[in-house]
């Protein structure tokens, strides 16, 4: 940027000067102004631009105001630079003209500035002189002179003047810099002729800056209301020093953002004036740091004050200092405690509050307990209750509401003696002496009239004679006389309460005490406590009921007195069912009012009195309130006493380690850690970097560690329970890892490969894999522990599966959940000569639990086992046997296996029979199916599917095969044994059955091709074909009954 670009002096807003002579005006060349000599300012000739193309009706340039390029002077500085006034002196006085060669060269940042309902466009001489606007420049407008002229002709002059002043005010802030320096035209060399000025104009602009102390023009216009937009005023109005700050003005120039320094966010100051910093020390101290400036070399002044001295005048601190706590039997004498309680009782009497008398009674009870080392007798308590009763009230009998005998509103008749007058029917009044009354009672007894004698004695109030006589009669009569006697007493009479209690009833005073009409409750409690005869539990319930009644009337201290007499245990604040939490305080109110200092002190005195008798009287739920009291002591500056409380609480927690709460332990250690420096013993023994701790605090830390370890150990059973399924999951994962190897052999004839089955999945079950090969392996080959099938015989899907799965079924029924219906719709039967294997075999010989044609000895054993069921079961008809076999085959074809009991209908492939449902009826449980022959049993040795459903072997039913099952019955037992391994179930499948029954058993590895199978003698049929066809296996029928679907 060239340094010779001039700056235009600020225009004057004062009164317009007189017209300048024509000789002093500059020449006119092509519509451009030339500088003409003007007045001197500071010894320098200043040129002034004038318009020599003045028209008869001069037009105002509405954009001229915004194009003022330099400083915005203040109102007080307009008259200081009169020689630099650049008003147009020709034409109308005071009307401004634009200078198109300089001011209109670069328009304002906003091209069409709206004011009111009109828009003011650019200067008309741009298009008239043929200047080509720059492409993409924001400083170019495309308005013609015709539009500008049309707009100017229809605008009043006064409005143009007002807008010029407003627009100059609003945009001088943004355009006070030199447009030749900031605009893009100066760098591209596109300045027009006549735009070169002397350098003296720049120096004049620097010397003509107004005073900083004057008020901003924007502020003045805002005050007088000349601003057209308050929003624009807020955008451009700044303080006076910022108006002439080049750094602040640089923020408004249209330059790239990277050239503008961006101020980072600054956090506001927390304090704007110097202040005192305050903190609390560990020994109940208040530490104050006075304000200072360390950068100026000032030393900070630290003041240490004692909170105990500052808060010495508070009533709460005085109350805490007067209490001799912590109350430890070895450290505090009971005389001091009794003195404190007596003072509190006297204060409660003088208070005059409604509960003051009951509060004083509680403090007196604590004095009595402290005097008697925590023990109390009924007579002592009765004496305490009757101390405040100066004179006993005279209890008057109220008018009877109803007779207790016949519930009639009648009273005893008037006493009279003498015969009734037969004429008038009246009885003459007669006054009889007590001797005459007793004589009449005796005369009636002479003649054996006991009932009349009782009535006479009751009418004449001879209750002693009546009670004695009725006691020797029947019990009903005695109760009648007793009721008559008690009805003569007042309801609020303590004698009435005692007699009702001795009669085995809850006195009416227990539910009515506390009313103003009833009277004082103390004599009733005194008579109950003094007379211990009767049922102790009834007496306790009466006292508790009386306390509940008093508590419902708002008499908390009186209710708690009754609870102490009934030995009600202390509870917790959050449990509404607990009657006692703090002595003399109801836990139905807010906690600050509930946990008052007086209530805590009262309860601590009670705890101290209980420990005086040598008995463990610590209240476990009260220790947290003692900790709260200790923290309050620390707040009031009594740090040493608070630390002693921590020691007492720690001792109590260690003595009740089983019932201590972990949160209480943590908070106690935390508070003791803060207050341990308040103990002089700790300060004396403190040495080195490590602070010495008392023994009880160290024991608390060890107890906390033990609690944390115990909590971690308590979580181990849960983790052990989680590990147990983990072990099972390991076994199952091994099983699932071998699953793809088994699925390779699912391409057997008539079967479809399928993933792990779901209860709704249908299809043919995949038989166990069999590897074709020689019957025996090579010589010297190791014999595996698991039997390996060498030959796989194609088995139809309609064949029944091996009966050896009954052991699986037995295991499934054993491990099933209670109430779960696990029974299969098939009835599992075995031939008579087959041996039932009820326990899984060893892992070393994991043969399948299938049927075997055993020797006659085993047949006898089976007969002996099933002989006890002979009279309970009836033989099934052969017709039902065939139907059962059809249903079994249909269940096998359904592909559900173990899940077949979920289905109520067979699949589409199953043969439909009208009598098919009869096998599932309850009547079918008494019928036995036809046992198959060994030839048919050999066909039943086909391996059950493993991959379709894990419990499929348990769902195998032994029944007569039909159709293709009989057509393939020519297979010998040796071929069957060689083809199916051991019992029709290979080693892995038998192991999987054990896995189901015993999850801890690991799954055996896959079978090895060419291995020699183990010999199982039980698979060799030794039973004739006709054996077992007539008698069912009743033991199997008993174990596996048929359940309806």
Curated annotation (Swiss-Prot):
Keywords, sorted A to Z: Endoplasmic reticulum, ER-Golgi transport, Golgi apparatus, Membrane, Peroxisome biogenesis, Phosphoprotein, Protein transport, Transport
Compositional bias annotation for Basic and acidic residues: 22-33, 149-168
Main function: Plays a role in the organization of the endoplasmic reticulum exit sites (ERES), also known as transitional endoplasmic reticulum (tER). Required for secretory cargo traffic from the endoplasmic reticulum to the Golgi apparatus. Involved in peroxisome biogenesis. Regulates the transport of peroxisomal biogenesis factors PEX3 and PEX16 from the ER to peroxisomes.
Stated name of the protein: Protein transport protein Sec16B
Primary location recorded for the protein, binned into one broad class: endoplasmic reticulum
Annotated Pro residues bias: 1-13, 942-953
InterPro entries: Sec16_CCD (IPR024340), Sec16_Sec23-bd (IPR024298)
Stretches with biased composition (Polar residues): 50-60, 989-998
Region (Central conserved domain (CCD)): 267-711
Composition-biased stretches (Low complexity): 773-784
Subunit structure: SEC16A and SEC16B are each present in multiple copies in a heteromeric complex. Interacts with TFG. Interacts with SEC13.
Residue ranges, compositional bias (Gly residues): 957-966
GO biological process, one term: protein localization to endoplasmic reticulum exit site
Transmembrane intervals: none
Acidic residues bias: start-end ranges: 916-926
Segments of this protein annotated with the region Disordered: 1-78, 149-193, 707-733, 748-789, 813-1045
The organism's place on the tree of life at top rank: Eukaryota
GO cellular component, one term: Golgi membrane
Subcellular location as annotated: Endoplasmic reticulum membrane; Golgi apparatus membrane
Tissue: Liver.
Species in which this protein is naturally found: Oryctolagus cuniculus
Modified residues (Phosphoserine): 55, 137, 186, 852, 858, 866-867
Classification via Gene3D superfamilies: 1.25.40.1030
Pfam families (UniProt xref): Sec16, TPR_Sec16
């Amino acid at each position: 940027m060239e340094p010779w670009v001039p700056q235009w002096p600020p225009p004057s807003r004062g009164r317009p000067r007189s017209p300048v002579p024509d000789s002093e005006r500059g020449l006119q060349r092509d519509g451009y102004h030339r500088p003409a000599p003007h007045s001197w300012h500071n010894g320098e000739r200043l040129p002034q631009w004038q318009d020599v193309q003045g028209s008869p009706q001069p037009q105002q340039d509405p954009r001229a105001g915004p194009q003022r390029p330099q400083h915005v002077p203040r109102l007080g500085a307009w008259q200081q630079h009169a020689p630099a006034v650049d008003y147009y002196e020709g034409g109308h006085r005071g009307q401004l003209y634009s200078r198109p060669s300089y001011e209109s060269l670069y328009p304002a940042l906003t091209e069409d500035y709206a004011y009111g309902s009109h828009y003011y466009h650019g200067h008309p001489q741009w298009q008239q002189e043929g200047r080509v606007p720059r492409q993409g420049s924001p400083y170019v407008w495309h308005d013609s002179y015709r539009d500008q002229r049309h707009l100017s002709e229809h605008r009043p002059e006064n409005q143009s003047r007002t807008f010029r002043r407003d627009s100059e005010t609003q945009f001088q802030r943004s355009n006070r810099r030199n447009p030749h320096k900031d605009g893009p035209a100066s760098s591209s060399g596109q300045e027009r002729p006549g735009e070169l000025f002397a350098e003296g104009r720049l120096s004049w602009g620097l010397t003509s800056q107004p005073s900083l102390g004057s008020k901003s023009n924007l502020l003045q216009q805002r005050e007088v209301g000349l601003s057209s937009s308050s929003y624009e005023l807020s955008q451009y109005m700044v303080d006076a020093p910022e108006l002439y700050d080049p750094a602040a003005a640089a923020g408004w120039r249209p330059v790239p953002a990277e050239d503008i320094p961006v101020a980072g966010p600054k956090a506001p100051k927390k304090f704007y004036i110097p202040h005192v910093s305050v903190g609390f020390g560990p020994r109940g101290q208040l530490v104050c740091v006075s304000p200072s400036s360390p950068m100026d070399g000032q030393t900070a002044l630290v003041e240490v004050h004692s909170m105990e001295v500052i808060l010495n005048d508070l009533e709460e601190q005085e109350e805490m200092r007067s209490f001799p706590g912590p109350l430890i039997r070895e450290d505090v004498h009971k005389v001091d405690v009794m003195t404190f309680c007596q003072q509190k009782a006297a204060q409660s009497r003088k208070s005059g509050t409604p509960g003051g008398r009951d509060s004083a009674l509680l403090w007196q009870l604590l004095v009595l307990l402290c005097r008697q080392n925590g023990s109390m007798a009924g007579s002592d308590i009765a004496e305490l209750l009757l101390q405040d009763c100066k004179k006993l009230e005279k209890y008057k009998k109220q008018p009877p509401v109803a007779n207790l005998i016949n519930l009639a509103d009648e009273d005893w008749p008037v006493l009279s003696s003498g015969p009734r007058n037969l004429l008038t029917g009246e009885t003459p009044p007669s006054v009889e002496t007590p001797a005459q009354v007793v004589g009449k009672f005796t005369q009636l007894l002479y003649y054996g009239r006991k009932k009349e004698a009782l009535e006479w004695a009751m009418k004449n109030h001879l209750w002693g004679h009546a009670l004695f006589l009725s006691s020797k009669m029947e019990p009903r009569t005695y109760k009648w006389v007793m009721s008559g006697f008690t009805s003569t007493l007042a309801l609020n009479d303590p004698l009435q309460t005692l007699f009702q209690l001795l009669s085995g009833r809850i006195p009416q005073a227990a539910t009515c005490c506390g009313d103003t009409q009833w009277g004082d409750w103390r004599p009733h409690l005194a008579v109950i406590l003094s007379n211990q005869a009767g049922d102790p539990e009834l007496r306790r319930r009466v006292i508790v009921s009386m306390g509940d009644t008093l508590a419902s009337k708002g008499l908390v201290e009186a209710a708690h007195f009754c609870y102490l007499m009934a030995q009600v245990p202390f509870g917790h604040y959050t449990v509404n069912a607990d009657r006692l939490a703090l002595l003399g305080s109801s836990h139905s109110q807010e906690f600050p009012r509930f946990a008052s200092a007086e209530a805590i002190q009262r309860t601590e005195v009670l705890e101290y009195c209980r420990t005086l008798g040598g008995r463990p009287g610590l209240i476990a739920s009260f220790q947290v309130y003692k900790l709260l009291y200790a923290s309050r002591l620390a707040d009031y500056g009594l740090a040493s006493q608070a630390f002693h409380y921590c020691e007492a609480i720690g001792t109590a927690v260690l003595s009740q380690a089983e019932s201590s709460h972990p949160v209480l332990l943590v908070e106690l250690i935390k508070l003791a850690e803060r207050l341990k420096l308040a103990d002089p013993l700790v300060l004396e023994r403190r040495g080195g970097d490590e602070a010495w701790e008392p023994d009880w605090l160290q024991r608390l830390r060890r107890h906390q560690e033990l609690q944390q370890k115990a909590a971690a150990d308590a979580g181990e059973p849960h983790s052990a329970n989680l590990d147990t399924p983990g072990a099972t999951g390991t076994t199952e994962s091994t099983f699932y890892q071998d699953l793809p190897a088994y699925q390779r052999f699912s391409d057997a004839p008539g079967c479809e490969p399928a993933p792990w089955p779901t209860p709704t999945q249908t299809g043919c079950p995949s038989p166990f894999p069999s590897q074709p090969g020689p019957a025996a392996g090579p010589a010297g080959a190791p014999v595996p522990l698991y039997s390996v099938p060498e030959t796989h015989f194609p088995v139809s899907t309609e064949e029944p599966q091996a009966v050896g799965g009954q052991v699986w079924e037995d295991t499934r029924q054993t491990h099933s959940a209670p109430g779960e219906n696990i029974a299969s719709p098939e009835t599992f039967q075995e031939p008579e000569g087959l041996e039932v294997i009820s326990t899984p075999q060893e892992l070393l010989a994991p043969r399948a639990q299938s049927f075997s044609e055993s020797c006659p000895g085993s047949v006898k054993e089976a007969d002996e086992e099933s002989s006890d069921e002979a009279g309970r079961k009836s033989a099934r008809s052969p017709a039902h046997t065939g139907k059962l076999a059809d249903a079994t085959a249909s269940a096998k074809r359904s592909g559900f296996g173990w899940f077949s009991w979920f289905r109520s209908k067979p699949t589409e492939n199953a043969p439909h029979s009208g009598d098919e449902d009869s096998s599932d009826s309850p009547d079918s449980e008494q019928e036995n199916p036809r046992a198959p022959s060994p030839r048919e049993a050999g066909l039943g040795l086909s391996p059950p599917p493993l991959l379709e459903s894990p419990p499929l072997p348990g769902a195998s039913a032994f029944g007569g095969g039909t159709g293709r099952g009989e057509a393939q019955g020519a297979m010998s037992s040796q071929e069957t044994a060689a083809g199916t391994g051991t019992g029709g179930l290979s080693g892995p499948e038998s192991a999987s059955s054990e896995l189901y029954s015993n999850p801890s058993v690991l799954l055996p590895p896959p079978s090895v091709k060419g291995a020699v199978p183990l010999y199982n003698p039980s698979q060799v049929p030794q039973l004739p074909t006709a054996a077992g066809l007539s008698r069912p296996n009743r033991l199997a029928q008993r174990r596996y009954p048929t359940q309806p679907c």
